[in-house]
Amino acid sequence: MDGKRRPGPGPGVPPKRARGGLWDEDEAYRPSQFEEELALMEEMEAERRLQEQEEEELQSALEAADGQFSPTAIDARWLRPAPPALDPQMEPLIFQQLEIDHYVAPARPLPGAPPPSQDSVPILRAFGVTNEGVSVCCHIHGFAPYFYTPAPPGFGPEHLSELQRELSAAISRDQRGGKELTGPAVLAVELCSRESMFGYHGHGPSPFLRITLALPRLMAPARRLLEQGIRLAGLGTPSFAPYEANVDFEIRFMVDTDIVGCNWLELPAGKYILRPEGKATLCQLEADVLWSDVISHPPEGEWQRIAPLRVLSFDIECAGRKGIFPEPERDPVIQICSLGLRWGEPEPFLRLALTLRPCAPILGAKVQSYEREEDLLQAWSTFIRIMDPDVITGYNIQNFDLPYLISRAQTLKVPGFPLLGRVIGLRSNIRESSFQSRQTGRRDSKVVSMVGRVQMDMLQVLLREYKLRSYTLNAVSFHFLGEQKEDVQHSIITDLQNGNDQTRRRLAVYCLKDAFLPLRLLERLMVLVNAMEMARVTGVPLGYLLSRGQQVKVVSQLLRQAMRQGLLMPVVKTEGGEDYTGATVIEPLKGYYDVPIATLDFSSLYPSIMMAHNLCYTTLLRPGAAQKLGLTEDQFIKTPTGDEFVKASVRKGLLPQILENLLSARKRAKAELAKETDPLRRQVLDGRQLALKVSANSVYGFTGAQVGRLPCLEISQSVTGFGRQMIEKTKQLVETKYTVENGYSTSAKVVYGDTDSVMCRFGVSSVAEAMALGREAADWVSGHFPSPIRLEFEKVYFPYLLISKKRYAGLLFSSRPDAHDRMDCKGLEAVRRDNCPLVANLVTASLRRLLIDRDPSGAVAHAQDVISDLLCNRIDISQLVITKELTRAAADYAGKQAHVELAERMRKRDPGSAPSLGDRVPYVIISAAKGVAAYMKSEDPLFVLEHSLPIDTQYYLEQQLAKPLLRIFEPILGEGRAEAVLLRGDHTRCKTVLTGKVGGLLAFAKRRNCCIGCRTVLSHQGAVCKFCQPRESELYQKEVSHLSALEERFSRLWTQCQRCQGSLHEDVICTSRDCPIFYMRKKVRKDLEDQERLLRRFGPPGPEAW
């Protein structure tokens, strides 16, 4: 029952019941209201008794569990500081809120508040932390959900009570069996004056109805019933169009009270009540307050600070079976390692390793060992409640660690384990989630509820924010932190666990490192700070940023601005629509430019266009509306796409106001950042200016989202239309002014333009001159556009290689004309991740020789050497690995894909470790019979090494290297010559040696030995033929020398891996597929075995050797 029932908000709150009831099938007979209420009361009483029984069982389990940590085992540093002795009548309660949600519970009487009229009411719950690090839960009472609808013609005050009664009765009938609804569904219907934000109508506010409901979940049925129509005396059955009926209850509350995500809240003295006993949560301070008494501090000045939050990072290890990925129904959890950090401190204050069976001590960490897995799981659950983290992080905790722990505890019947949140008695449950978008494809994931704690899975953050070749923790740590980690295959973990206390210690160190790295990533990438600032800027709860899409952020800002002006957001049904023309790209003048190219960039182009031309929902004129409203030509504009909007002199748009606020706030934040010296405040300010920039740019995207809350094709297509016009005008202005006729040394030419920038060749020879002319041109062109549109000088490229649209490279100069900042590449294989590393490395190396060294001959020679090495099998396999994301099931792909077919084959070999949806699949292309499709030749790199499968080097040359190299060298060498020099010639006449062990004819062929000297086939098992026997000693020495070289190489690689794992005295067991050393070590080990086998053919030394 527990697994199927949706958990409620806390003790004493009955769970919700599914829609429908006893009388659904018999519409002719309806029970009286008294009979319905009587049946409901009996059901509620039964639920209450059942819940009390469950709570007693949980409480006894928890009391037994708390004994898992003896007083001596609990480090005092784990505990939060003791809460102060607050006097609610004299002292305010101030805290930074992290999460806001709501639950439904019996109303509580509060001083100064009217007596509650409902048995069950929605109560908002804000979790947070004080400046001293004390945890707080604030129950906010008295706020009810509401929405608007236009009053139908003829509707007057006399119809208010009738509409309230009829709608309430309709909702009650619709919600039969809803246990929480014990009073009227509609609390109030009021007449007010408002105006729709969609379109300029010219008539000002009109009559609207504000409908207040008893519960948030009644919003959807109320909206549906109103759209169907409600019978009213004298008005017939009018249909009502809902406004703001799709706004989340928490967003509604935050908008109305001017609360933004992660800001500081103040409960004034004398306005709140502390709960000394009977608390519903594990928080140290628990308060009740009326919603109208909460004071919200805007995140500015001293209120920008971040409370000393407790961040917990953890990782688990499981003992799987050979060849099978761990399953929670069968495989035990053997270790759980946790690290705790107080935000703002440089080092974790807590390092804890909980292990199954004894483990040797670990310096700097506390080790707790258990003989029973049930005790281990219960101890970690108890530890979570003792340590009480505000933020929980890790790597893939959302899809593996947390679901595994909960499922395993359920299998072992550990009763108190799932109580991981802050609400007493509320279990953490797992639900499946699926997300699909055009950019990311489909991602299946799990969601674990943990009320009161923010979950930040670093894997999910990186998947959403960064485009990487691989997303394993090892690859990500190397990319961002510059450090590697030992990666132990799940099959080896069981062997370490079954060893002794030292092998278990090694496993615990590995597990601690896996918990430590996500914490480092969280800090290095400023994930928490940036997310908090984004929540503050957009006004949504922190949890929404991590689990919801982009649109809710703009909706929140739109609602806040609209509320100040009496405007309402309509509920728009969208199913996708027509597309529109995107930004302009000026046709590139391809080539290699050995002169400086100045780049001029429009600052915040799309937001600037929307502000300059007052483009908004509120200013949009429908076709013919300008004439009907009697507007003159100077009161509205016609955009390049033919759409019409009123000017700011008639009405200032909401979107331009929002954008002005965001960009001016960003300007202030950047000015403060320039002066600030405190590193923590610098982090906050940097996160704030970034959040403001992203938010401003997302407003345009919100209007263009065809399946969205409020799409408006007229706005989005007008913005891109103005953008195209501006790019073309900029080109014309630059090429008209900077000419020989106007006194300049050379006539300027715009060689390329893309969306918001143009690349200009002024014909000067020095970077300093190009910078001066670029600044002058930017200022001059800006004067031809309305404010705040501004063209800025951004950088100079010298030299510059322009290959095609969206593809170019050059040395970038932005501040100093005498030193380049970096080599900048766009759209080239040096920065793309859909090819093998060999391509990126070769393209980067070639560009460096072309652009930095100015050595085209050296670049050509290097490319030829790499091609020769490839064809002669001298390239390490790690450089040939291609990775592609598995975005959907095999059947959903239109054609056969190499990575999809390999994933299916790997699933047949080992279902547990096969890639799943959302994973990136690494593969190499192997040789096969002529005509075999490429998707059939994909193979797992490790499988290729273990079975000595030959690589299809021609595929890598023709399909991976050829096009990128020709793109770079054709502008320099010429089209025909580049192909002849790079892809033909002596360096391509290399013979590869096939060494496969499986597949094809090799599976049926019988191997015969050859003479090591002359390669003649031998009839015996010796090393040399009779003709080479006089040289046997010389050949033997040569092979021994080769063996020594291989041993030395293997020793160097082994030592490097030992340094990475942190011990020079233990075997290397790392199997990180993202590390090139791993593939080298595997290859050299195999070469060593082959070389030793070859030397054994010489036989034992004869007597003459002694």
UniProtKB/Swiss-Prot annotation:
Binding annotation for Zn(2+): 1011, 1014, 1025, 1028
InterPro entries: DNA-dir_DNA_pol_B, DNA-dir_DNA_pol_B_CS, DNA-dir_DNA_pol_B_exonuc, DNA-dir_DNA_pol_B_multi_dom, DNA/RNA_pol_sf, DNA_pol_B_thumb, DNA_pol_palm_dom_sf, DNA_pol_type-B
UniProt cofactor(s): [4Fe-4S] cluster
Pfam families, alphabetized: DNA_pol_B, DNA_pol_B_exo1, POL3_N, zf-C4pol
Glycyl lysine isopeptide (Lys-Gly) (interchain with G-Cter in SUMO2) cross-link, renumbered residues: 573
Annotated residues for binding of [4Fe-4S] cluster: 1057, 1060, 1070, 1075
Localization: Nucleus
Binding partners and assembly: Component of the tetrameric DNA polymerase delta complex (Pol-delta4), which consists of POLD1/p125, POLD2/p50, POLD3/p66/p68 and POLD4/p12, with POLD1 bearing both DNA polymerase and 3' to 5' proofreading exonuclease activities. Within Pol-delta4, directly interacts with POLD2 and POLD4. Following genotoxic stress by DNA-damaging agents, such as ultraviolet light and methyl methanesulfonate, or by replication stress induced by treatment with hydroxyurea or aphidicolin, Pol-delta4 is converted into a trimeric form of the complex (Pol-delta3) by POLD4 degradation.
Listed name of the protein: DNA polymerase delta catalytic subunit
The organism of origin for this protein: Bos taurus (Bovine)
The encoding gene: POLD1
